[in-house]
């Protein structure tokens, strides 16, 4: 699954937010934070792993999850690029609106 499809689900975004704040959490700790069934949360964790958004380390009988910092950095870079593109477009729209306002005032 691609990154954006993985991020489309609010439960998966919540898991990522928790991991970002806590650093590392066991699968059990993650399960305990949600009212959904363990299999449902396991599926969400699988999607996050497949999208390379989280890393998992097996310690004894536990699976410890953490955010993949490289993937988060790539998302941040992409989001900043998109913000710049939108800023340019909004600035152009502001200019058009200013011209239209002046026309209305002049001929109003």
Language-model-derived ranges and their functions:
Residues 4-5, 64:
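Short basic coil micro-motifs at the edges of alpha-helical modules that engage polyanionic partners
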Residues 45-46:
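Short, hydrophobic-biased segments on the C-terminal half of alpha helices
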Residues 58-64:
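Short, Lys/Arg-rich nucleic-acid/phosphate-binding segment
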Residues 5-8, 17-21:
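Short, locally clustered residues in the helix-turn-helix/winged-helix DNA-binding domain
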Residues 1, 9-13:
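Short alpha-helical elements of helix-turn-helix
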Residues 18-21, 25-26, 32-33, 38, ...:
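C-terminal regulatory/oligomerization modules of transcriptional regulators
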């Amino acid at each position: 699954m691609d990154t954006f499809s993985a991020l489309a689900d609010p439960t998966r975004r919540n898991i990522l937010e928790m991991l970002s704040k806590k650093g590392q959490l066991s699968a059990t700790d993650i399960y305990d934070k949600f009212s959904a069934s363990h299999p449902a949360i396991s599926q969400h964790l699988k999607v996050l792993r497949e999208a390379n958004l989280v890393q998992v380390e097996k310690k004894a009988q536990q699976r410890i999850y953490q955010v993949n910092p490289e993937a988060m950095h790539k998302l941040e870079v992409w989001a900043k690029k998109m913000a710049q593109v939108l800023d340019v477009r909004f600035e152009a729209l502001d200019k058009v609106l200013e011209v239209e306002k002046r026309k209305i005032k002049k001929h109003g």
